[in-house]
A protein has these predicted regions:
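Residue-level marker for buried hydrophobic side chains located in beta-strands
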Residues: 124-125, 155, 299
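Active-site metal-binding loops of divalent metal-dependent hydrolases
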Residues: 127-129, 159, 232, 302-303, ...
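Acidic/histidine-rich helix-loop elements
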Residues: 126-139, 236-274
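Short, aromatic- and cysteine-enriched interfacial helices/patches
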Residues: 1-4, 109
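Metal-dependent phosphoester-hydrolase catalytic domains
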Residues: 3-6, 21-79, 86-92, 204, ...
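Cytosolic juxtamembrane amphipathic/interface segments immediately preceding
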Residues: 13-20
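Structured beta-strand-rich core segments of catalytic domains in phosphoester-bond hydrolases
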Residues: 94-119, 131, 135-138, 147, ...
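Stable alpha-helical elements in mature extracytoplasmic
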Residues: 138, 142, 165, 169, ...
């Protein structure tokens, strides 16, 4: 009997964690809980109009930070203290599953490299061209790239403002199927469309200095098609601001802590202010689409906002489908500059279409943005 009692105590001692292990588990669980809370707050920020609380524009940008932080802490927890962390991490990520999928969709059975064009499809390309590459040689290459996409609709933002260069671009597209061209703007911004379908009308929906949204009525063989080309309000971040932020993130900043803090506040303040202006632009888009209710819609452009943002959420709430979410793959970063890697260019469509392919071409070297494309299929034959 004594021997049996000793064996029981040995097993009990072996299963009891040491004080250090217990403290580590508690700290890890606490850190995981804080990261999950941040993840939930950033995910929920899409429901809040920045005009009510401007800092939600910054909270959405923090989503990937909290996401990767949560994943990292959860994996560490599963390796060392699984009993304390497995359920917590599962619940934390599960609650945000839809938002995570929007940020990084996975479609293993969709081939975005090959496509067979049919009359039942529309291929759309949206590209912030950074003034068509700035420089004639790169401009020629960029135009050649767009022609080679064999798209039915090309929407561009930050187009070429020089009238002579615009005429040259028009002449390049003249012998192609996409020879209908319409553009408008100033020295600060040119927004335009290149289409395989006749352009019935171009209308300015709303504009800010350097940003504008235009609506187009196209004559498609199936009937009138509405296209909205968006360049939502930019965050107005200058090159030095971005470089300073990059240096700080990489621990290479030569500024003192106070200067770093002031620069960070300036950066966040600009992002927050621009988010409120994007909200006003979404209102204008909603009013425009209400005027064309019942007609098929394609909406695309440079949103200057990520998949986890009020702008993107509001556009989707207008009854539009996010093509990249439905048929894209991975993060699809469309803007890569300094330490910033985000998808801020998007393509949406009305329920008249089904996206079957969507892709961000991360190899195109002509602009500070990457072009995004989508192939849309008409769901029903025209009655």
């Amino acid at each position: 009997m004594p021997f049996f009692s000793k064996s029981q105590n040995s097993r009990k001692d072996a299963s009891t964690p040491s004080p250090m292990a217990h403290i580590f588990g508690m700290l890890l669980s606490g850190a995981l809980g804080i990261s999950i809370l941040g993840l939930w707050i950033s995910a929920a920020s899409v429901y809040i109009d920045p005009r009510l609380f401007k800092w939600v524009g910054v909270l959405g940008l923090a989503f990937p930070i909290f996401l990767f932080g949560t994943l990292f802490l959860w994996i560490i927890g599963l390796l060392f203290v699984p009993r304390k962390t497995w359920l917590l991490g599962l619940i934390g990520l599960g609650v945000c599953a839809q938002r995570i999928y929007t940020y990084c969709p996975i479609h293993p059975f969709i081939d975005n490299e090959t496509t067979t064009a049919t009359t039942n499809q529309i291929k759309v390309v949206s590209y912030n061209t950074f003034f068509f590459g700035r420089g004639m040689e790169q401009q020629d290459e960029l135009v050649r790239y767009l022609i080679d996409q064999h798209a039915d609709i090309i929407c561009f933002q930050e187009g070429e403002a020089n009238p002579d260069n615009l005429k040259k671009i028009e002449s390049r597209f003249a012998p192609t199927p996409t020879h209908y061209i319409s553009y408008e703007g100033t020295q600060e911004e040119v927004v335009g469309i290149i289409s395989a379908y006749p352009i019935l009308e171009q209308k300015l929906i709303i504009a800010y200095p350097g940003n504008a949204i235009y609506g187009y009525r196209l004559q498609h063989p199936r009937g009138e098609l509405i296209v909205v080309n968006c360049h939502f309000r930019s965050n107005l971040l200058s090159g030095p601001t971005l470089e300073g932020y990059t240096d700080m993130m990489h621990g290479k900043s030569k500024e003192d802590k106070r200067s770093q803090w002031n620069n960070t506040k300036t950066l966040f303040s600009k992002i927050a202010h621009s988010a409120t202006e994007r909200s006003e632009m979404v209102d204008a888009v909603e009013d425009y689409l209400a005027q064309h209710k019942g007609k098929p819609v394609i909406l695309c452009g440079d949103f200057n906002d990520t998949p986890v943002s009020y702008t993107r959420y509001r556009v989707a709430s207008l009854g539009l489908t996010d093509a990249f979410r439905e048929a894209g793959q991975g993060f699809g970063f469309s803007f890569r500059r300094n330490a910033i890697r985000v998808r801020i260019d998007h393509i949406f469509c009305s329920k008249d279409f089904e996206p079957i392919q969507a892709k961000v071409d991360e190899e195109a070297p002509y602009s500070d943005h990457q072009p995004i494309s989508a192939t849309l299929v008409w769901k029903n034959e025209k009655k």
